[in-house]
Regions:
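Long alpha-helical rod scaffolds of large eukaryotic non-enzymatic complex subunits
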Residues: 1-189
């Protein structure tokens, strides 16, 4: 291997290492604002469901833009860009599912309690239920609010960028775990 080839190889290795560090920065920025919250407290106090701040979105956007413009010398930089988007989506997905989990558990427990009533007639005729006593309405409002907030944040992140074509897969990766957990609970609810 000639000196020029060695130098080029070293330069590519440094670029890949730098790209990986930028991916880690994306994860750190997203993680800093993705600590699970008590959605019931937010919903009952009338506060808007929190989302990523504009400052965080702007910082992540700049990092992603940097990764998307790196030369495709070994195709690893393109991989780093996609990895950064996937990592961002994983962090936000974990935030959503962790934040919704206590309310989902309350809905499931309420549904289980109603279903435990053993009667000979159809459940609807004899199951005691007081309107508003089940946490379903609050859970549904929280679900819709979190999805809307996440969609707004993702829209801001992708707005005006050359990589807008990655929006649908990224938002899908963010919401899929939450929607899958709801789907898994539907037979109980």
């Amino acid at each position: 291997m000639s000196n020029q080839e060695q130098l080029r190889s070293k330069m590519l290795s440094l670029a890949d290492l730098g790209a990986q560090k930028v991916v880690n920065l994306v994860v750190q920025y997203a993680s800093a604002e993705s600590k699970p919250i008590d959605l019931l407290t937010y919903m009952s106090s009338g506060k808007r469901v929190p989302s990523l701040t504009e400052e965080c979105i702007t910082s992540i956007k700049a990092l992603l833009q940097f990764l998307s413009t790196m030369p495709d010398s070994q195709n690893k930089s393109d991989h780093a860009f996609i990895l950064a988007l996937q990592s961002f989506a994983q962090v936000r997905a974990a935030y959503l599912t962790s934040s919704m989990e206590p309310m989902t558990r309350a809905v499931v427990n309420s549904a289980n309690a109603v279903q435990r009533i053993s009667v000979d007639a159809p459940r609807e005729a004899h199951a005691e239920y007081r309107r508003g006593s089940a946490p379903f309405a609050d859970w549904f409002k929280a679900m819709i609010s979190t999805i809307q907030a996440e969609q707004e944040a993702a829209t801001m992140l992708f707005q005006g960028m050359s990589w807008k074509n990655m929006y649908s897969s990224t938002i899908s990766n963010i919401l899929q775990p939450l929607l899958s957990s709801v789907h898994d609970q539907l037979p109980i609810i």
